[in-house]
């Protein structure tokens, strides 16, 4: 290395500017280092040297300070000493596919390893089939009951669950082939191995092939994108019963007369309402209240909506024992004994990391078994990245896909970070729940002084025209700047308007700037404008579409 030659390193494991300061101090303590500039947001270190300093000495100093490190290449399409990079991708869901396609686009060769069905959770046993089932249940509900029953006769529908299931799974198969299998089959730069991967060391995995035998796959970079599976709580007797997780519930060939649901996760609530609308008597056992971590008004609104539909919500209730005999589940609770024909357990999802032998590669996980990554999807082990539900990031397929794309860019020598400050989230109950940014309580915990306004839907013309005014829109603004920092919505179409709020937050708009925008009349998203106007005026005193 010549005098004053800058050397760039990629640093993993930093979580704040204080970490960057520790890395800088470690590097500047190496003899021959004149100056080190370390950036936490970029996860990089730029080192100015005086004379010859071995790269290994710099790496050793960073590792000794508790962080991961590897030399950084700045090429847009990465090469490895002039050779094509080989990237191993473990998994085939949203994160895995996004990474594989972006890596190939930038010149890499990819080996994708999948132990089960191509496509991962979302298309096969998650988002897609659940939303189809929820939509079918919504149609059944409207035929049974709607705001227009005075002029349109309501007729109790006949539910043919087998036919609905055939329709649902046909669309699942269609999307899996179109968006996953077909794309992989048509890409010569991607080799698919069917089998289970386990790390041999930090540069190779052993694949136990589904059709027998094993293969060692060497890699320059590796992405772990193995997703998550339903978590099962350690309730005495539960594992000895034929309980459902969401996987079994979504492909059930019949609708149970009585369904008990353990958990109040997003999956629990979505499927509880769907089964209720398809004919089940549903009882939810919630350890706390619904939407415990969100604004309290959200949980109150959904609890009221569920109870109005005949769904029994038992708050602060846990099963202490589960038994199954003669085709019936018996749950012991603090409220007495609960009997059901089927039991759905939906208490959350656990990362699929236990069988990967991550310790052989030196990859760190947290107490929940999730792989710890930085904003660039780097693990603490050089050359190994992770994305999606197996990491400590939010478990949404769009987050996983974005993470996979950025991981590929970083693997290939680029610099891309995943910014989740304006990440929208939607729960597909009815009414839907959609959030983005800060709640008032979260802002308070971060020391941000806020001003909030809540607009009930009886002030939104579209809701009035629909004769469905259940719900609200709440805006959270920063005091002083007036900048919008959070939005919470409970509304039948909450998911269709939350991205507008996310863009407003991303672009650092004030509530006044939002109030001044043009919104089409008689749309639900117009409610955002009306909510913004409540910061300075009484919207009840405005004409229908006052600007």
From Swiss-Prot:
Disulfide bonds join 122-127. Residues 5-70 form the HMA domain. It comes from the Bacteria. One of its GO terms (molecular function) is mercury ion binding. FAD binds at residues 96, 121, 131, 197, 389, 397. It catalyses: Hg + NADP(+) + H(+) = Hg(2+) + NADPH. Gene3D superfamilies: 3.30.390.30, 3.30.70.100, FAD/NAD(P)-binding domain (3.50.50.60). It holds the Pfam family Pyr_redox_dim. Its EC number is 1.16.1.1. InterPro entries: FAD/NAD-bd_sf, FAD/NAD-binding_dom, FAD/NAD-linked_Rdtase_dimer_sf, Heavy-metal-associated_CS, HMA_dom, HMA_dom_sf, Mercury_reductase_MerA, Pyr_nuc-diS_OxRdtase. Its cofactor is FAD. A metal cation binds at residues 16, 19. Keywords: Disulfide bond, FAD, Flavoprotein, Mercuric resistance, Mercury, Metal-binding, NADP, Oxidoreductase, Redox-active center. Homodimer. The active site is a redox-active disulfide bond. Resistance to Hg(2+) in bacteria appears to be governed by a specialized system which includes mercuric reductase. MerA protein is responsible for volatilizing mercury as Hg(0). Belongs to the class-I pyridine nucleotide-disulfide oxidoreductase family. This is Mercuric reductase. The gene is merA.
């Amino acid at each position: 290395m010549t005098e004053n030659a800058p050397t760039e390193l990629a640093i993993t494991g930093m979580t704040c500017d204080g970490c960057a300061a520790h890395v800088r101090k470690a590097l500047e303590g190496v003899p021959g280092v004149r100056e080190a500039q370390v950036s936490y947001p970029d996860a990089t270190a730029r080192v100015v040297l005086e004379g010859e300093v071995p790269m290994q000495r710099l790496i050793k100093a960073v590792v000794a300070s508790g962080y991961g490190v590897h030399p950084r290449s700045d090429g847009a399409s990465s090469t490895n000493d002039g050779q094509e990079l080989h990237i191993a991708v473990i998994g085939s869901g949203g994160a895995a596919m996004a990474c594989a396609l972006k890596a190939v686009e930038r010149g890499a060769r990819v080996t994708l390893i999948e132990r089960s069905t191509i496509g991962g959770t979302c298309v096969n046993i998650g988002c897609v089939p659940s939303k189809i089932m929820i939509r079918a249940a919504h149609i059944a509900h409207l035929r049974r009951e709607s705001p227009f029953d005075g002029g349109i006769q309501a007729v109790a529908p006949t539910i043919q669950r087998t036919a609905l299931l055939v329709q649902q799974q046909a669309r699942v198969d269609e999307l899996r082939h179109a968006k996953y299998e077909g794309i992989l089959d048509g890409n010569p730069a991607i080799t698919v191995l069917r089998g289970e991967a386990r790390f041999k060391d930090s540069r190779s995995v052993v694949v136990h092939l589904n059709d027998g035998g094993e293969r060692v796959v060497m890699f320059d970079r590796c992405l772990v994108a193995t997703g998550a599976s339903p978590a099962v709580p350690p309730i005495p007797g539960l594992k000895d019963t034929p309980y459902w997780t969401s996987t079994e519930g979504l492909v059930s060939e019949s609708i149970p007369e009585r369904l008990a649901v353990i958990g109040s996760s997003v999956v629990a609530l979505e499927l509880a309402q769907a089964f209720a609308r398809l004919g089940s008597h549903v009882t939810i056992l919630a350890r706390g209240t619904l939407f415990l971590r969100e604004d309290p008004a959200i949980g109150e609104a959904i609890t009221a909506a569920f109870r109005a539909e005949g769904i029994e919500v038992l708050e602060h209730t846990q099963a202490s024992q589960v038994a199954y005999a003669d085709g019936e589940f018996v749950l012991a609770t603090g409220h007495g004994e609960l009997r059901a024909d089927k039991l759905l357990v939906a208490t959350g999802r656990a990362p699929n990391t236990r069988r990967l032998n991550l310790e052989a590669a030196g990859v760190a996980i947290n107490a929940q078994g999730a792989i710890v990554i930085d904003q660039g999807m780097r693990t603490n082990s050089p050359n190994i990245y992770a994305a999606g539900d197996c990491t400590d990031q939010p478990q949404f397929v769009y987050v996983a896909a974005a993470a996979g794309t950025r991981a590929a860019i970083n693997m290939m020598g680029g610099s891309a970070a995943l910014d989740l400050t304006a990440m929208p989230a939607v729960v597909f109950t009815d009414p839907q729940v959609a959030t983005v940014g800060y709640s008032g309580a979260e802002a308070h915990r971060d020391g941000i002084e806020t001003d909030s306004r809540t607009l009930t839907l009886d002030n939104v013309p579209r809701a009035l025209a629909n004769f469905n005014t259940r719900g609200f829109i709440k805006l959270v603004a920063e005091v002083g700047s007036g900048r919008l920092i959070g939005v919470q919505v409970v509304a039948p179409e909450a998911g269709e308007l939350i991205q507008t709020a996310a863009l407003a937050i991303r672009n650092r708009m004030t509530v006044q700037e939002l109030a001044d925008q043009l919104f089409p009349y008689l749309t639900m998203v117009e409610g955002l404008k009306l909510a913004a106007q409540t910061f300075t005026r009484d919207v009840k005193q405005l004409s229908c579409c006052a600007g």
